[in-house]
Amino acid sequence: MLHQGIILREGHVTRTIYNLIKDKRYEDVIECITSFGEAANTRAGLSTLGHCYYHAQKYEEAATCYEQLCQLAPKEAKYRFYYAQSLYQAGIFADALRVLKQMGDQEDELREQCLQLQSAILYSSEDFAGAQSLLNQRAGGTADTLNDEGCLLFQADQHEAAVQRFQAALQVGGFNPLVAYNVALAHFQKKQRAQALDYTSEIVERGMRNHPELGIGAQMDIPDGGARSVGNPITMAISGITQALNLKAAIEFQDGNEEAARDALLDLPPRAESELDPVTLHNMALTDVEGPVAGLRKLAFLLELGAPSCPKETFANILLICCKNELYETAADILAEHTDLTYKYLSQYLYELLDSLITAQTSAELAEKKLGTLASSLAGKLRSLAAKVQEVRATNEQQALRDALKDYEQALELYLPVVMARAWISWRDDDFVGAEREFHASAEFCSENSIWRLNAGHVLFMQGDKYNEAAAFYEPIVRQHSDDIMSVSAAVLANLCVSYIMTFQNEEAEELMRKVEKAEEMKGNLGKQYHHLCIVNLVVGTLYCAKSNYEFGLSRIAHALESGSGNRLYADTWLHVKHCILGLLTGMAKQNIILPYATVQEVLNFLRFCESYGLFTPANIFSATEQVPEEPLTIGLEARKLRLLLIKLSEYDNF
């Protein structure tokens, strides 16, 4: 018999089947056995099929096989155990528990395994008390028991004790990537990022060494989806690769390194989108380069899957992304449609914060009142915790001091977003003085926080008469990253340059721009593209245009954008250009501005450049809620119109 390239010779069928199983070719075995007809329904056939379905991660099919085996051989306890195990892996917890309870304590050799499986089911069902009760009945000191004890401690937020249990499990049972991942996760929760990354690195290195067939990193080597999918073999599940790289991505994402987070996800074994596990799909949604709409679609899909497939963080993240991208109506609709998830997955704090942001769209006064109440509550808690830190510091009890500082830092993490939300309500109405008041009010707790200082600098900068004060906030950020100035936001560098210029510190501005230019050239030699200098020149040029110095201002803007490939010309940068050009044209139409012939020539040449390189580049930015026209205006078309207007106003009819 020839079956899809597999030769099944008479008398050698069993040997061939077992060789295929040895080579982990479970799908081939399934196809071979199911083609045998009635033989597939024998005890031997069902047993082999159940084993292969389970290891091919087709758990519902495996459960069906073991259910039939339980009927064929009702006295075989192992079949009932495998049946329950398959149901558990398929997420059918209630039926799995029912099967285990029917087994009772009849089989001593399976007692420990049954208790372990029961506690796993209760843990997955979030019945932690029940899981703990069963754990107390199990043999102590084994690697499995120590790991499960660590999981329950982790769930109870006792992360230090959890780390100790997980490490003990590694010592007793040897290296296990899934237990090592648990250690990494506990370190991550303790904000010990370096230790967490050490464990994830070891898991990935061992995975690459032991499982080259998984193609780890292949997506980085063969970009644009060219790498061949490896599917979801059981080796991927037990290698811990998926968990480790997702955790690495989460660490980078929390640190603000979104590109590094995407790279970590690209290191995952290549799979089609339909083959991705829920956690990977969730993290890809958060880092989606196509923008928030594409990410929201992925998260909405996960939300529809429901528990246990949908990661519990999905609900909060879909709401946060909506608010971050000003999709407040969408956020309100999601909250209204999923009231059950609101109580289950949102803390009282997060619900109140999101509710305030949504309320601000219809009543800024009511939103401010809600945020004020929340801020007052958290400020009171911070003062109490600060006093506790001082008390404990006097006792010289180091562990108590660490715990007190941790509590204070956690409360501060909650307070800061509330401060930013209150300042944002004033900011969006261009009430920068009101926003500054919020920063003054919160300085008692937040003045050393880098995010707070950055936004305080922005608020001062926008007032237009506090450039010295703004520079005082921006300068420490730039100094802190003097070894890698490209890691500083281009907006900060641009605002600092403007602050220097507006306070007559032109030499400092020029020096900063030289540093940026030099750093950008060095990074460019390494194959990395940065637009920091472009943005700085754009902002500085816009500033001079606003002061009616169009000759110098437009020369800065042209210098910022004119590059061989035109890759700096896109909707965001074009917005600066056309605002300045329109300002120039308005002044010329009113006969308030007269430009030298040479300057007009330079501006016309620059607009020709924009026309040429922007012929197919969209000229406008559309939000996620706006309807994009079928034939949107391009930069090239707008540049041509502006060039014709400039020709008319300059009376140069020969151009």
Curated annotation (Swiss-Prot):
Protein name: Tetratricopeptide repeat protein 30 homolog
SMART domains registered for this protein in UniProt: TPR
Predominant cellular place of this UniProt entry's protein: other
Pfam short name (any one): TPR_2
GO cellular component labels: axonemal microtubule; cilium; intraciliary transport particle B
Any one GO BP annotation for this protein: intraciliary transport
Species the sequence originates in: Drosophila melanogaster
PANTHER family linked to this entry: TETRATRICOPEPTIDE REPEAT PROTEIN 30
Compartments (UniProt record): Cell projection, Cilium
InterPro entries for this protein: TPR-like_helical_dom_sf, TPR_2, TPR_rpt, TT30
Family: Belongs to the TTC30/dfy-1/fleer family.
Function: Required for polyglutamylation of axonemal tubulin in sensory cilia. Plays a role in anterograde intraflagellar transport (IFT), the process by which cilia precursors are transported from the base of the cilium to the site of their incorporation at the tip.
PROSITE patterns: TPR, TPR_REGION
Record's keyword terms, sorted: Cell projection, Cilium, Cilium biogenesis/degradation, Repeat, TPR repeat
Molecular function GO terms recorded: intraciliary transport particle B binding
Stretch forming the signal peptide: none
Domain of life: Eukaryota
TPR repeats: 10-43, 44-76, 143-176, 178-210, 385-418, 450-484, 534-567
